[in-house]
Amino acid sequence: MKKISNMKPLLVSAMLFLSVTGKAQSHGNRLSVGVGALYERGFDVTLAVEHETKNHNAWEYFANGYVKWAKDESARHVTKESFWNNYRTWGLGVAYKPCVVRSRNKYGSLRIGASAGSDTHEVVGWANLGYEHNYVLRHGWQLYWQVKTDLCIKGEDLFRTGIVLGIKLPTGSR
């Protein structure tokens, strides 16, 4: 009987430890901004709201802007006019991001999504596929890099692929 009474504090501690679930870096909402360079001669900006679900899986709702620059034939280099007025698109979309790699203060996710928008003349659509790696900082801030590929439907480009760097800020709501 004495052995059981000595084990009670240990059993109660073990039960409390097992009943408390870990919530660190999980189930948060974030605002993110990313900028990147895409092949061929492209510049990309993405603003997004990310809602994290279980196990670092997440849904991302985003707005994207893209500019494809060209050389000005008369000046023989890129000018302000040839940068901003060559080809540009904007789009709105959603992406599912299942977590595929996790370790201390970092995790990686596939990014699978679709978006639609315009190239200022007609409706354009994209299938989005990529990989995103996140580094968790203090107070919920995150830095990330992303390798992305967009398959364009009815656009000037068929494929757009490149690297994006960005930051995610916690919204405070869980």
Regions found by a protein language model. Name each.
Residues 2-11:
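Bacterial N-terminal signal peptides that target proteins for export
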Residues 14-23:
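Hydrophobic h-region of N-terminal signal peptides that target proteins for export
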Residues 22-71, 162, 168-174:
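Short glycine/proline- and aromatic-enriched beta-strand/turn motifs that initiate or cap beta-hairpins
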Residues 33-46, 86-88, 115-127, 151-160:
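Solvent-exposed loop/turn segments connecting transmembrane beta-strands
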Residues 50-143:
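Gram-negative (and chloroplast) outer-membrane scaffold detector with strong preference
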Residues 120, 130-174:
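Gram-negative outer-membrane beta-barrel domains
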